[in-house]
Amino acid sequence: MPGGPGAPSSPAASSGSSRAAPSGIAACPLSPPPLARGSPQASGPRRGASVPQKLAETLSSQYGLNVFVAGLLFLLAWAVHATGVGKSDLLCVLTALMLLQLLWMLWYVGRSYMQRRLIRPKDTHAGARWLRGSITLFAFITVVLGCLKVAYFIGFSECLSATEGVFPVTHAVHTLLQVYFLWGHAKDIIMSFKTLERFGVIHSVFTNLLLWANSVLNESKHQLNEHKERLITLGFGNITIVLDDHTPQCNCTPPALCSALSHGIYYLYPFNIEYQILASTMLYVLWKNIGRRVDSSQHQKMQCRFDGVLVGSVLGLTVLAATIAVVVVYMIHIGRSKSKSESALIMFYLYAITVLLLMGAAGLVGSWIYRVDEKSLDESKNPARKLDVDLLVATGSGSWLLSWGSILAIACAETRPPYTWYNLPYSVLVIVEKYVQNIFIIESVHLEPEGVPEDVRTLRVVTVCSSEAAALAASTLGSQGMAQDGSPAVNGNLCLQQRCGKEDQESGWEGATGTTRCLDFLQGGMKRRLLRNITAFLFLCNISLWIPPAFGCRPEYDNGLEEIVFGFEPWIIVVNLAMPFSIFYRMHAAAALFEVYCKI
């Protein structure tokens, strides 16, 4: 039975401590104390309970996949104008899925409120505050989008189905309750009603994915119609232009307001798309955490400090301002005439090449710092971190598919417009930059977080090699009985003193040389500032590169070269499949970089 604070240690422990630590200095705790019998962390998973829980996980995942596949087929049937499948049928299916999720969330929130006095395990890595803040912002814009859709429905109420008015209202209610649910329960580790909860959570995951796919399809149809209208301007008259227009066949009152609402809806779709995919990822982590046994170590809260990142922030904000200017000029010039369209494409490629070169260089410097620093890796099981890494690689493949398609089209084309030679380095850099950035982010999220703030760590450097200060700290700990619960800075002080002293004795160095080795911590502040600037710069650059494709600046559509080589329909299918993943990659990379910044 472990002793309480201040209890004397056993003789064996005392002898081991005296051998490991210099005289007069208390030994560092080598391991956390044993857990009390009966605690959730102490009891390992029961052998008999693993089979039904694994079966429930398999059954729920298959249920979710069937819901998703069936929903995708409804979306496809509506997109290709299949007989007997109209927009009202699709909206009825999505509304029913949302209502079912609403019932489950209300039941879960009500049951949690009834059991609010119970202590429940939490996954401290899941549902970070900044992530919940981001999803709240996107949810607010999604609710505004729903209001615009309701106003659009009122304007065309004479010829629109009632489901087109019910759907945005249901979606707005679903969004508000889901954000409340994620704020309060994203960190939960569900240990009761696990089979039922698995089906409820996985239903929520794939409902959000279907809503995401619906938004992507609507936004892609709008972008494709605009692209078809611009192709004739670029001189590609051999491509048949057939607009896939779903405009209601009646007059709107007033017409100017309805036109403004229609344009406003499509400008808000990118934020709605990000909201749905973020919600599905947070719910997926909740699903993976059902029945999970957490370890006893408490996760240290990350505190983001925004001092010392002036250079990275200024460079990143400069890129952001340049991005907005490029997008505005691009949207004004593209499609006006062939010469203006070509100049807009060249301008975009030059801008993107410059930004990608800077981002690749920053990522290489950051990875080199990690190679020199040789910090230990965090090998603990973390569903949220694993999902982040998997999403980075999976969504990055969307851009790689488009880039390799452009490279192959340039190599096989019979005639090459002037902007072709800017498209080639741009496509190569997209591949290389994502490769480098993924390595930097993945290595960063697997590093152990800094245990002590920078100012405390610097203070520890100054006092660590003073034997009087170490002895005073040891006596203070002994008198207060806080060998385990003491201040992290003091505990780290003693640990560092012990380690430095032991290394000096083994190497035969004198005290002055040992002091020099201990002062190596001073270099850590410079490394951290450099890494913070790199991360801040990459964060703002990823936000910048998210803006052009999200708001219609898509050279993969507008240069026309790939459509000639691969054919119009095949290339459009490739772009419509890969572009949503490419757009989401930038936002997800920005979120991951923000988390990396807080860890440094």
UniProtKB/Swiss-Prot annotation:
GO function term, MF aspect, one: identical protein binding
Cell location: Cell membrane; Cell projection, Microvillus
Assembly: Homodimer. Interacts with STAT1, independently of STAT1 phosphorylation status.
Variant or mutagenesis effect after changing H222A: Does affect alkali activation
Outcome reported for the amino acid change (mutating K149E): Does not affect proton channel activity
Cytoplasmic membrane side: 1-56, 111-128, 187-194, 289-309, 369-386, 443-532, 594-600
Gene Ontology BP, a term: inner ear morphogenesis
GO CC, any one term: plasma membrane
Entry's transmembrane regions: 57-78, 87-110, 129-151, 162-186, 195-217, 263-288, 310-332, 343-368, 387-411, 422-442, 533-551, 570-593
Record's bilayer topology term: Multi-pass membrane protein
Biased composition (Low complexity): 7-27
Free-text note regarding domains: Residues involved in the gating by extracellular Zn (2+) and pH are located in the extracellular loops between transmembrane domain 5-6 and transmembrane domain 11-12.
Knockout consequences: Knockout mice are phenotypically normal. They show vestibular dysfunction (inability to swim) and otoconial agenesis. They also exhibit severely diminished cellular and gustatory nerve response to acids. However, they do not exhibit any difference compared to wild-type mice in behavioral aversion to solutions containing high concentrations of mineral or organic acids, possibly because of the activation of nociceptive neurons through an OTOP1-independent mechanism. Knockout mice show a significantly diminished aversion to NH(4)Cl compared to wild-type animals.
A Pfam family hit: Otopetrin
Origin species: Mus musculus
Consequence when changing R292A: Greatly reduced the currents in response to NH(4)Cl. Does not affect response to acid stimulation
Protein name: Proton channel OTOP1
Keywords: Biomineralization, Cell membrane, Cell projection, Hydrogen ion transport, Ion channel, Ion transport, Membrane, Transmembrane, Transmembrane helix, Transport
Chemical reaction(s) catalysed: H(+)(in) = H(+)(out)
Function in brief: Proton-selective ion channel. Biphasically modulated by acid and alkali, mediating proton influx and efflux in response to extracellular acid and base stimulation, respectively. Sour taste receptor, which carries inward currents in response to extracellular acidification. Sensor for ammonium chloride (NH(4)Cl) in taste receptor cells. NH(4)Cl acts by increasing the intracellular pH, thereby generating a driving force for proton entry through OTOP1 channel. Might also participate in alkaline sensation.
Primary location class: membrane
Upregulating conditions: Up-regulated in adipocytes in response to TNF, but not IFNG. Up-regulated in epididymal white adipose tissue in animals on high-fat diet.
Outcome (variant: L408Q): In mlh (mergulhador phenotype); affected mice have defects in the formation of otoconia in the inner ear, but do not suffer from deafness or other inner ear defects
Residue ranges that the UniProt entry lists as topological domain Extracellular: 79-86, 152-161, 218-262, 333-342, 412-421, 552-569
